[in-house]
């Protein structure tokens, strides 16, 4: 879709609020935020997905009509459609829409339309987008700037994926997985890092992925700003020839916003930010990990650039509640091991599904709880990712004490030989560094888990598929423990 088409659709939306907007894949993390904003703006919203969730119930309560199946009947009275990137071209509703000449927009195209009259701030990168966007949202809200926000995860402070604000600020997570972020034209772009992921969409070329990020950055005008992590080599490779202002952040001594003296105690991260004028800021975070210090540094760089009061910014970060499924502490479990013996375990839930994300989570746990028995329940996500990063997965997954590995969550991808959980299990077991077992039936999780408990355990639920709902239901049901 070109700019002229977007302008036509923009006029169509603004002038015809009685028209019906239908979102295919409305339950996806990236789609729910758009649906919330459209409902708040007063549009008629319908949508379809395959599974019910708390957020889908919330959308229904706000007035959306949602179908828990895909059918051409769902778009009977639809004027145009927004599709998730997870929806295939042969989806029944997509095919029916094409026959009826109903306009179809990608998620990113819709965000660009919503953002077009605002000061757009886009948060991109392989890792850390959702947490960084959440931090920025909190800082702007706490500073009274009332932004509009669309995030890829639940922001705990507002208990939502999105917020409609009254100010000129529009903050959004920008998705690089299918290069759709190139539809966006923000004033400010943050790039947290660039690593090989989703490279099947880039002809299996990391170079092409980096070049796409460069194209995205070059969309910033002369009066815009790029805020980038100087610790990441791939980012440094593409910073040449940008006409806009560049602000760097990181642990690197040359960073404009530099992290200094990072320390960690349990769930608390503490560090200083050193600015170019040698001013020092004392930062306390309620979430641990150097990667989260980097996320905070990106938010700090933006806040300073926008003239937000330092004290308000520091207080906001100190009160930051985190993001759903990003190193989320769910509580303690007391699990009956039999023979009047119980194991008290910490339960942590994390969305990370890339080897780098897994590695950072493991490091964070080892720093704060070095003597704990670390048990990871892991569900690989996508055959393509498992195939492309196979060696890294094997090495990283061998770093936990106990690994319970579920079958790959395919996300509708076709099976790839050698990129399955059985192959991972066999190769990790060969290393002999940890106890690893393959979970072929979800009902085996608790029984297998009980055999590995030592009484000083951390249970880490890890993955981006449906592992969170599977593990939560089993653990809560079997232990009869309400997780906070």
Swiss-Prot record:
UniProt-annotated location(s): Cytoplasm
Catalytic activity entry: UDP-N-acetyl-alpha-D-muramate + L-alanine + ATP = UDP-N-acetyl-alpha-D-muramoyl-L-alanine + ADP + phosphate + H(+)
The keyword Nuclease appears for this protein: no
InterPro entries per UniProt: Mur-like_cat_sf, Mur_ligase_C, Mur_ligase_C_dom_sf, Mur_ligase_cen, Mur_ligase_N, MurCDEF_pg_biosynth, UDP-N-AcMur_Ala_ligase_MurC
Short name of any one Pfam family annotated for the protein: Mur_ligase_C
Function of the protein: Cell wall formation.
HAMAP family in UniProt: MurC (MF_00046)
Family: Belongs to the MurCDEF family.
Protein name: UDP-N-acetylmuramate--L-alanine ligase
Gene name as annotated: murC
